[in-house]
Amino acid sequence: MVLPPILTRLVLVLSMAFAAHPLAAQTRPAPGGGEPPVVAPGVQIAALGEAMRIADVIAVMREEGLQYGSSLEAELFPDRGGPRWQAVVGLIYDADTMRKRFDAAFEAEVGRDPGAIAGMLDFFGSERGQRILQLEIEARRALLDESAEEAAKIKVEDMSARNDPRLDLLQEFAEANDLIELNVAGALNSNLAFYRGMAEGAAFDEALSEEQMLADVWSQEGDVRRETEEWLYPYLALAYGPLSDSDLRDYIAFSRTPEGRRLNGATFAAFDAVFSAISHDLGRAAAKQMQGEDI
């Protein structure tokens, strides 16, 4: 049984800018040349998560998840889910649980290099950084609408046909942040977690070994990569359309700094933890639904 690819749209960071936060000022030298106040790493990381507007990002991801739950029902057990399945999906995509999982993983990752946090906040704690963040969230929410997603895809096709140099910049941004590879890896991890959940729920006639599940998931790599690219560039074109080339180049430059790379890796790792857990729970719940059991 080959499951439909689960393209979990992990946050496209550095496609997570930060709003201005008082912590950015706290890390600068004190007036008169004195030492700046010491801020505990845990406090810094918590402030960074709030500055990144993770709650708003998770709210959009929850909406994406509810839509995906409906698609999963149509694929695996058409017209047999109903309100009960919708309620289960809503619990699995519980925003508070998602946030707790994100925070735990994010703190562990960023905590390895707390000295980088000030640089992250310095870059994004500006009017431009706030604007970038708002554009990213608005674009992600807009793409919940299929017509908006289709329009964004057509725009990218037109940019490609015209050899628009802006598309080159978007590709440079994606490469600087390794967005294709990290999203593909995250999606495959989520697919494997879904498989494991299905196996735990006894969805298969015969037990599958870990090797069999890994092989089946890896066979989806090409499809997942194609879907990632088909979603990523329309998203980037929509989100960064209002930005000047100069602003986008500065964003790319920051992405290549040690702080930018650290943040990128930490955010992907944190959302990978979130979506692996969600996918496992979805797989187990889907297996029980397919068998007509109480979830």
Predicted regions and their residues:
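Extended amphipathic alpha-helical interaction segments
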Residues: 140-241
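Extracytoplasmic/secreted proteins, especially bacterial periplasmic and envelope-associated proteins
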Residues: 43, 47, 97, 101, ...
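Bacterial N-terminal signal peptides that target proteins for export
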Residues: 1-11
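Bacterial N-terminal signal peptides
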Residues: 9-19
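Compositionally biased, proline/threonine/alanine/serine-rich low-complexity intrinsically disordered stretches
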Residues: 16, 23-48, 173, 213-215, ...
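Short acidic/histidine-centered micro-motifs embedded in hydrophobic/aromatic stretches
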Residues: 123, 135-136, 176, 254, ...
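N-terminal Sec/ER secretory leader and immediately downstream segment
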Residues: 27-146, 282
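A cross-kingdom marker for long, charged
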Residues: 214, 222-295
